[in-house]
From Swiss-Prot:
Protein name: UPF0179 protein Pisl_0688
Family as reported in the entry's similarity comment: Belongs to the UPF0179 family.
Coiled coil (residue ranges): none
Residues of the signal peptide: none
Originating organism: Pyrobaculum islandicum (strain DSM 4184 / JCM 9189 / GEO3)
Pfam family of the protein (one): UPF0179
Membrane-traversing stretches: none
Tree of life domain: Archaea
Amino acid sequence: MRKIITLVSREQAVIGHRFRVVSIPDECKSCKLYAVCLGKLTPGRSYEVIEIRPSLGQRCKITGEEVVPVVAAELPIVGLVPLNKALEGAIVTFEGECKGCKDCPDNIVKPGEKIKIIRVLGRTRCKDRDFATVEFYILEAPLPSELGAVGTYQDHSRAPLLRRPLK
């Protein structure tokens, strides 16, 4: 579960409040608070307020209302994956096999993105195929600073693997 510090209205600054980012208005992108407000959130994803921080009296450029810093947790996405990929804890590549089916998350997840399946909720049939309804998180892509010269991910958390003959 990814945690993000962001800004919400005073009315939304309640622990347990859930909200979904539908889109980001163009007016927000020129606001000085954008980077700490909607700039950290992803359209199509849902969040839950888990901690409230002290307010510094900032106001929203659009509503004029006070905004409050909160810690929000990204909630899992509910969608379809083929049955052969539906294993709790598995990290799989979303291929969009369910495109056109009800509950297909193809408007949120792009084909080729890695997802981690949290829980299998049930089964469904669409287009003569069996799918599992699952809760999952989209795994974040590595930061540009973590990419090497050829665009491959370099994990700096462990030493390089060396192959040595056994003695």
